[in-house]
Amino acid sequence: MTKVMIVEDDPTLRDIYTTRFMAEGYDVVSASDGELALTTAVKEKPDLILLDIMMPKISGFDVLDILRATPETKDTKIIVMSALSQSADVERGKSLGANAYLVKSQVTLTEVVEKVKETLKS
């Protein structure tokens, strides 16, 4: 079963994403902050990570940078999901190695699921 990791500090959003991805047939693990995201990613080895940027302890940008530098996670597919919509933020995410960057206010849950499916195939 394909494993997706949801990294989101907002418990309501985390629950919504978790419920939807489980309904789509994915094995789902989650983390509520950047620090937990790093340890969970190495331990659980997800096929894809949905990564928030503005989080407690360690920002999503720093998490992304560390994941790409860690042998166990350097090739994991990562989609950034953030409220940050400035082009500089999008470029930073992509330059740090995100496979895609989605702005939360600009995508529906169905579009997020489709982007995950598309990214997993690539």
Could you say what each language-model-derived stretch is?
Residues 8:
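Conserved acidic carboxylate
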Residues 11-29:
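Two-component/phosphorelay signaling modules centered on CheY-like receiver
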Residues 30-48:
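Acidic, metal-coordinating helix/loop segments flanking the phosphotransfer/catalytic sites
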Residues 33-36, 59-65:
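Acidic catalytic/metal-coordinating carboxylates
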Residues 52, 82:
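Active-site residues of response regulator receiver
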Residues 55:
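Receiver (REC) domain active-site loop signature in two-component systems and cognate sites
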Residues 60, 69, 94-100:
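As written
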